[in-house]
């Protein structure tokens, strides 16, 4: 069963062969461990970045405090939203935000413009209500009015019509608000939406 090797040269060669195989196995294991460690580090950094991005999308939102419309000839020609930061949100720059307008006649995406409200077209503008900035929400106590010209987007909003407004911040978080025009606009200058 076991063979005895009596020649000294043959015994040394078997030992060197075993040593070479052992060293080769150690090298292969070291390379595999290095690849595994690099892959784990890459996945950890990707996971961390994805987590931070998801956290920003969830936490860096705005809250719509109120909405009202200006009435002209028994139609709503301006839609105004009062917005503030959600709890725990970072600074929100409304100039880098978009508003998706899905109304009775048209769906479009509005972008920021510093123009006067009557010349907005498919844009929106902002005015400070409370706070030092007219277009950046810095503190939770800040309030900014977002103004959209309904006639510039599609047409004025009549009695009973509604428009879906989705505000997307620079972080990618979305806040949706349904603005419902009351059934009666007679003898009114402004209405709650």
Swiss-Prot record:
<keyword id="KW-0325">Glycoprotein</keyword>
<dbReference type="GO" id="GO:0097588">
    <property type="term" value="P:archaeal or bacterial-type flagellum-dependent cell motility"/>
</dbReference>
<keyword id="KW-0974">Archaeal flagellum</keyword>
<protein>
    <recommendedName>
        <fullName>Flagellin B3</fullName>
    </recommendedName>
</protein>
<feature type="propeptide">
    <location>
        <begin position="1"/>
        <end position="12"/>
    </location>
</feature>
<dbReference type="GO" id="GO:0097589">
    <property type="term" value="C:archaeal-type flagellum"/>
</dbReference>
<comment type="similarity">
    <text>Belongs to the archaeal flagellin family.</text>
</comment>
<dbReference type="InterPro" id="IPR013373">
    <property type="entry name" value="Flagellin/pilin_N_arc"/>
</dbReference>
<comment type="function">
    <text>Flagellin is the subunit protein which polymerizes to form the filaments of archaeal flagella.</text>
</comment>
<dbReference type="InterPro" id="IPR002774">
    <property type="entry name" value="Flagellin_arc"/>
</dbReference>
<dbReference type="GO" id="GO:0005198">
    <property type="term" value="F:structural molecule activity"/>
</dbReference>
<dbReference type="Pfam" id="PF01917">
    <property type="entry name" value="Arch_flagellin"/>
</dbReference>
């Amino acid at each position: 069963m076991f063979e005895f090797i009596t020649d000294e040269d043959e015994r040394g060669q078997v030992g060197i062969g075993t040593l070479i195989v052992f060293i080769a196995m150690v090298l292969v294991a070291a390379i595999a461990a290095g690849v595994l460690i690099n892959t784990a580090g890459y996945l950890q950094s990707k996971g961390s970045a994805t987590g931070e991005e998801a956290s920003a999308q969830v936490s860096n939102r705005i809250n719509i405090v109120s909405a009202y419309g200006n009435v002209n000839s028994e139609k709503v020609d301006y839609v105004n939203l009062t917005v503030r930061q959600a709890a725990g949100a970072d600074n929100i720059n409304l100039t880098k935000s978009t508003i998706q307008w899905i109304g009775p006649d048209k769906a479009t995406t509005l972008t920021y413009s510093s123009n006067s409200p009557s010349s907005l077209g498919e844009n929106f503008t902002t005015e400070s209500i409370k706070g030092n900035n007219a277009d950046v929400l810095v503190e939770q106590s800040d309030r900014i009015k977002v103004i959209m010209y309904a006639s510039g987007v599609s047409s004025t909003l009549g009695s009973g019509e509604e428009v879906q407004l989705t505000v997307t911040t620079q972080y990618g978080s979305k806040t949706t608000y349904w603005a419902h025009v009351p059934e009666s606009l007679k003898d009114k200058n402004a209405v709650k939406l």
